[in-house]
Amino acid sequence: MGLLAYLKTQFVVHLLIGFVFVVSGLIINFTQLCTLALWPISKHLYRRINCRLAYSLWSQLVMLLEWWSCTECTLFTDQATVDHFGKEHVVVILNHNFEIDFLCGWTMCERFGVLGSSKVLAKRELLCVPLIGWTWYFLEIVFCKRKWEEDRDTVIEGLRRLADYPEYMWFLLYCEGTRFTETKHRISMEVAASKGLPPLKYHLLPRTKGFTTAVQCLRGTVAAIYDVTLNFRGNKNPSLLGILYGKKYEADMCVRRFPLEDIPADETSAAQWLHKLYQEKDALQEMYKQKGVFPGEQFKPARRPWTLLNFLCWATILLSPLFSFVLGVFASGSPLLILTFLGFVGAASFGVRRLIGVTEIEKGSSYGNQELKKKE
């Protein structure tokens, strides 16, 4: 094992990475709070500044994927589709099977220059997650409780606000509503059978309200739908902890572009279109399982240096005073001061672990299990 590979497995190194992410995130969030004063003066300027502030935070996670773990992402698509990347507003539909599916989406956003302006329809609980939820709030992310009767007006208003967004945005939709688990899949297929819909093997039944509403509200702004089907070579099931330990994964993404004018305008037909899309996604996953590749040309967009440079800048700014402080604590010889510092380190470690836990499937939401609970 080389020195770098050894360092990637060390808890202290992970703690330092977490320290840089958390402290820089708090600085970024405070700066975002200050930019609220710009909103009544220039909404466009507020948005452009916050896109760059968000980039400075999100790119640290992308750096872990691209430069720390050296995970490779391969696109299976065509040149005409690639030529549109980063040059239009789009809605992205991504399967929700993996703990780092969002990170693979973000690395593609970064490579095509839309990471800071990327959007998502997110569950409202994430608004309370430090750094992540707070940054999303300033980015005008649309949050929902996943109860359509309560969400309808909030979602519509949030989507319509994005109609004049000044930067090209990729708006991510997880139409399945929650991460795939065997229990959720069984319940979902019971619902599909009751509605006379074909069963899906690798996906949950898509929930159509968010999709049809997004299409209706963003029509005229969004140019296309990108359907992205993600899987990993070697039947791997990657995790954010694995990335932190430097494990390398190989992600494959099949990307199909559908011009928005090809999507039916009425809600019922659009919902039927989405169900058909998920049947096609299921067939793509079956092909991947059998052949190990998706159809289409292979593209490997080059990683850019900005994510690494951004992290190194933050690390230089934040770790130098930290090391001086730690040396001062231990040089003082005060047991109380040393114990207090160690307690802070333990609390910080716990906090970082909780942030990572947000991505873990076994600690994910119970959304999708509700019908099972009713039966019990």
UniProtKB/Swiss-Prot annotation:
Residue numbers covered by motif HXXXXD motif: 96-101
Which CDD domains does the protein's record reference? LPLAT_LCLAT1-like
Residue ranges, Cytoplasmic compartment?
1-124, 340-376
Task: Spell out where the chain crosses the membrane.
Answer: 125-145, 317-339
Instruction: Supply the gene name.
Output: Agpat3
- Those parts of the protein on the Lumenal side are 146-316
Q: Which UniProt keywords apply?
A: Acyltransferase, Endoplasmic reticulum, Lipid biosynthesis, Lipid metabolism, Membrane, Nucleus, Phospholipid biosynthesis, Phospholipid metabolism, Transferase, Transmembrane, Transmembrane helix
Effect on the protein upon substituting residue 176 to A:
Loss of LPA acyltransferase and LPI acyltransferase activities
User: What EC class is this?
Assistant: transferase
Catalyzed reactions: a 1-acyl-sn-glycero-3-phosphate + an acyl-CoA = a 1,2-diacyl-sn-glycero-3-phosphate + CoA; pentadecanoyl-CoA + 1-(9Z-octadecenoyl)-sn-glycero-3-phosphate = 1-(9Z)-octadecenoyl-2-pentadecanoyl-sn-glycero-3-phosphate + CoA; heptadecanoyl-CoA + 1-(9Z-octadecenoyl)-sn-glycero-3-phosphate = 1-(9Z)-octadecenoyl-2-heptadecanoyl-sn-glycero-3-phosphate + CoA; 1-(9Z-octadecenoyl)-sn-glycero-3-phosphate + octadecanoyl-CoA = 1-(9Z-octadecenoyl)-2-octadecanoyl-sn-glycero-3-phosphate + CoA
Cellular location(s): Endoplasmic reticulum membrane; Nucleus envelope
| Task performed by this protein | Converts 1-acyl-sn-glycerol-3-phosphate (lysophosphatidic acid or LPA) into 1,2-diacyl-sn-glycerol-3-phosphate (phosphatidic acid or PA) by incorporating an acyl moiety at the sn-2 position of the glycerol backbone. Acts on LPA containing saturated or unsaturated fatty acids C16:0-C20:4 at the sn-1 position using C18:1, C20:4 or C18:2-CoA as the acyl donor. Also acts on lysophosphatidylcholine, lysophosphatidylinositol and lysophosphatidylserine using C18:1 or C20:4-CoA. Has a preference for arachidonoyl-CoA as a donor.
Major localization listed first in the record, in broad terms: endoplasmic reticulum
Superkingdom, according to UniProt? Eukaryota
Example GO biological process term? CDP-diacylglycerol biosynthetic process
The protein's name in its UniProt record = 1-acyl-sn-glycerol-3-phosphate acyltransferase gamma
Per the entry, what modulates this protein's activity? In males, activity increases in an age-dependent fashion, maybe derived from the induction by sex-hormones.
- One Pfam annotation reads Acyltransferase
